[in-house]
Every structure is written in structure tokens, then in C-alpha cells.
């Protein structure tokens, strides 16, 4: 199904605050974890045509253009984010568009780039097929999402302690068992984006993800589970230590299979 309307409404309502947070580098998860990993795994972009899917308020497009891309187009389902993007980066082409129905000719782009967008979709298959259609032969789709292990972890918090638990507690010699987390099933959950913004996204196990890649005509050529950058260690030690051992994001690099 298309992006949940409640997600669109939430991003429209908080578009200015969201955009500010993207630009002031206060989101350490982006700055020291997700963004270096996805940018570091981009292919060569000289003279390439690029689509930014879920471009938000447009910040990533300047970087992609600086790598030599010939044409960079950004799309997002949020009208307010696209409005901010057009104000901020008037030299770029921004459009309000649903990822499941990409309104471009066949084989139009060399690369489709998407940062932390796909997990807002209940089903990826229609979007994957739409992306495949607009990619040129051997074109690349690179995107990041919340890691399914991380979204499967159960959260426990009180005033003093914040815990993230996965596994089970088996009470010996009884039928009692406590299970923490749920990896193998697909379900909707709330995700904290910022102080102002909590939206729904969707957990799905890796087995479903891989099957949808195959069904939509893609070959998986790389998978990255990034650790936090070492530059964050001194200033954000807890963040750095957690993300040396526990994955929060995953980057997929797919290639359109030759016809």
C-alpha cells in the first residue's frame, strides 16, 4: 500500500522542525552512523542521472550533485517537505510523488538513492518494481532502513534505566517462558524521529526482504551493517559503544538484473 496517510500528515505538520534537525547536524544517528555508511557506498556518479526517493527537505541532493551527477531529481510524499526543499535548493528538481507509482519513463535513471524511507512502507514489493522499471540496465538502487534486528528488540524504560532486550527467559522445570522481542513476524510499530515527531513504520524479517528483491528483478550486490564512526567516541561514548556491537541501520545495494 502507499505511504500511510498518518505519516504524511505528521511530516507535513512538523516539516520545519524536521528540516532544521537535518541541517544543524544534531541527529547523531545520521551524522555518525547512517549517512557516512550510505554515502561511502555510492558508486561513481560522474555524468549519472540520479533519483532521490524520499528526499525530505533536500539536504542529501547537494552532496550527490557534488559527486558529479549530471541530473538529480528529488521526490517525497510530503508536500510541506517538498515546499521547503524548493525554497532551500531552487536549482534542483523536486516533485511530490508516491514511491509506488514513479511517474518517469522506463530506464530513466542510473541510480536511485533512498535514505531511511523504505521502512515507512507496509509492503516494499510495489515500490521495488516501480524503482526497477525506471532504472537503466544494470542500474543501482541503494537505500538504508532500520535494521530488522533493531526493530525486533523489546524496549523497557523507567526513570533510571533504558533497556533494549532480545531473547527469552526459560523458567526451569515449569511451562513458563518470557520472550523478549519479535523478529520473525511482520508488524507495525511506532518510531521516534524527533522530540516533535513520532511516526509508524514497519518491521519485516530479512527473509521477506530478500524474497521481494528477487521477485522484483534485483540482485543484491552489497549489504552494510554500519558501526558508529570513531569521531563520535569522545563526545557520545554511550552511543559509540552501543553501535560497535548492536546494529541500528542496514544499507542495501541492489542491481537491476539484465533483461
Identify the residue ranges that each predicted region occupies.
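Core SAM-dependent methyltransferase catalytic element
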Residues: 216, 238-259
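Class I SAM-dependent methyltransferase SAM/SAH-binding core
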Residues: 51-53, 57-101
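Short alpha-helix
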Residues: 200-224
Amino acid at each position: 500500500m502507499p505511504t500511510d496517510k498518518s505519516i504524511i500528515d505528521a511530516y507535513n505538520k512538523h516539516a520545519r522542525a524536521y528540516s532544521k534537525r537535518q541541517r544543524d547536524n544534531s541527529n547523531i544517528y545520521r551524522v555518525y552512523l547512517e549517512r557516512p555508511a550510505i554515502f561511502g557506498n555510492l558508486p561513481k556518479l560522474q555524468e549519472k542521472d540520479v533519483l532521490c526517493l524520499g528526499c525530505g527537505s533536500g539536504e542529501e541532493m547537494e552532496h550527490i550533485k557534488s559527486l558529479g551527477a549530471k541530473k538529480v531529481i528529488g521526490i517525497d510524499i510530503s508536500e510541506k517537505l517538498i515546499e521547503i526543499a524548493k525554497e532551500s535548493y531552487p536549482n534542483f528538481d523536486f516533485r511530490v510523488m508516491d514511491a509506488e507509482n514513479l511517474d518517469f519513463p522506463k530506464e530513466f535513471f542510473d541510480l536511485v538513492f533512498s535514505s531511511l524511507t523504505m521502512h515507512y512502507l507496509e509492503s516494499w514489493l510495489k515500490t521495488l518494481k516501480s524503482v526497477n522499471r525506471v532504472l537503466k540496465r544494470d542500474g543501482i538502487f541503494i537505500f538504508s532502513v532500520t535494521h530488522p534486528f533493531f526493530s525486533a528488540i523489546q524496549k523497557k524504560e523507567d526513570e533510571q534505566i533504558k533497556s533494549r532486550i532480545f531473547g527469552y527467559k526459560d523458567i526451569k522445570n515449569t511451562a513458563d517462558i518470557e520472550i523478549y522481542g519479535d523478529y520473525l513476524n511482520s508488524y507495525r510499530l511506532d518510531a521516534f524521529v524527533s522530540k516533535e515527531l513520532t511516526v509508524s513504520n514497519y518491521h519485516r524479517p530479512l527473509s521477506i526482504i530478500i524474497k521481494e528483491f528477487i521477485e522484483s528483478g534485483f540482485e543484491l550486490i552489497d549489504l552494510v551493517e554500519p558501526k558508529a564512526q570513531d569521531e563520535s567516541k569522545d563526545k557520545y561514548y554511550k552511543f559509540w559503544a552501543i553501535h560497535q556491537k548492536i546494529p541500528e541501520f542496514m544499507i542495501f545495494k541492489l542491481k537491476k538484473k539484465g533483461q
